[in-house]
């Protein structure tokens, strides 16, 4: 067994290697060009479209989708169970999840509880495990989101969904287990009422909150995790203990997409609503200057950083670190994203080269499940599953 000093040296060497890799080829690369329309080894394929009929009872809304995706959902749920059982081999944790979790968490707001019950029934997966599957998006979402404004005042919103860090590494093909298992679950969703689109979103089958979406002609919205000592674990503990005056962040995002009727209304709700976990809300509108990053603590807004093209701020970039702080030295996606945007210039920013920026390592990395591009005014919403072949950084 390694002595403490030798172990410390090994860990230090590993950290230094990762830090260097963040800023050196082949782990990074010059800004990609001409990657759109998507093709080649970093492109897994387009996300399929499904319609969610909001006129149906919540229990039945996800039936068609979950009939198709139940086998893939069972795979990822079993992987999560196996990881838990690795640390607690007795199986007691999963027994508590299956038997006690629904009662501990109590009633969820709005339609969400009935929707999860419907998903559990269709997939034959215990409700506690479906709830756990919905909860864990509050903790493991590492993403890059960008809103950019061109010289004509036109807005483009892009995001990489990075998910699955530390949730199992496959040594046979150098990939994150959960990241790979999420790709077959990636879907585009058209939420309709009276046969008309209310909003569109990209998500994972089985998850009833939303992390990425837009309301055609009005606004676009993405959600990134924010690391904080006063984090989501405390929010969930408060919820279990009966203090339920805060919203689950994925449920809030979906509620805003479904009900808000303007950029300003969405911004106001996202800024003021109490939430269970700290988060970044990246919001884009339909006219010049309507783009911002809302940095949220659980109880209040800490910062609203807005586009201001007249002052040279024609884009906002958000990863998983407060903009006024340096990113973690092992995980700097902000710097290469900004570098590629600056090289692109406001004169040339477009749907196509937004995809270029999001395809450049390490903005694209082993955790990247999908890339979404949004043009609110043109009603464009495209989601593509991604791969990052070696050499590629783990996050």
Curated annotation (Swiss-Prot):
InterPro entries: Acid_ceramidase-like (IPR016699), Acid_ceramidase_N (IPR029130), CBAH/NAAA_C (IPR029132). CDD domains: Ntn_AC_NAAA (cd01903). One of its GO terms (biological process) is regulation of steroid biosynthetic process. Its main location: other. It comes from the Eukaryota. It holds the Pfam family CBAH. Belongs to the acid ceramidase family. It is found in: Lysosome; Secreted. Its EC number is 3.5.1.23, 3.5.1.-. The lineage of its organism: Eukaryota, Metazoa, Chordata, Craniata, Vertebrata. The keyword Nucleotide-binding does not apply. Lysosomal ceramidase that hydrolyzes sphingolipid ceramides into sphingosine and free fatty acids at acidic pH. Ceramides, sphingosine, and its phosphorylated form sphingosine-1-phosphate are bioactive lipids that mediate cellular signaling pathways regulating several biological processes including cell proliferation, apoptosis and differentiation. Has a higher catalytic efficiency towards C12-ceramides versus other ceramides. Also catalyzes the reverse reaction allowing the synthesis of ceramides from fatty acids and sphingosine. It comes from Macaca fascicularis (Crab-eating macaque). GO terms for molecular function: fatty acid amide hydrolase activity; N-acylsphingosine amidohydrolase activity. It catalyses: an N-acylsphing-4-enine + H2O = sphing-4-enine + a fatty acid; N-dodecanoylsphing-4-enine + H2O = dodecanoate + sphing-4-enine; N-tetradecanoylsphing-4-enine + H2O = tetradecanoate + sphing-4-enine; N-hexadecanoylsphing-4-enine + H2O = sphing-4-enine + hexadecanoate. N-glycosylated. The record marks 162, 320, 333 as: Important for catalytic activity. The keyword ATP-binding does not apply. Heterodimer; disulfide-linked. The heterodimer is composed of the disulfide-linked alpha and beta chains produced by autocatalytic cleavage of the precursor. The active site is at residue 143. GO terms for cellular component: extracellular space; lysosome; membrane. Disulfide bonds join 31-340, 388-392. It is an enzyme of class 3 (hydrolase). Pathway: Lipid metabolism; sphingolipid metabolism. Glycans are attached at residues 173, 195, 259, 286, 342, 348. Keywords: Disulfide bond, Glycoprotein, Hydrolase, Lipid metabolism, Lysosome, Secreted, Signal, Sphingolipid metabolism, Zymogen. This is Acid ceramidase.
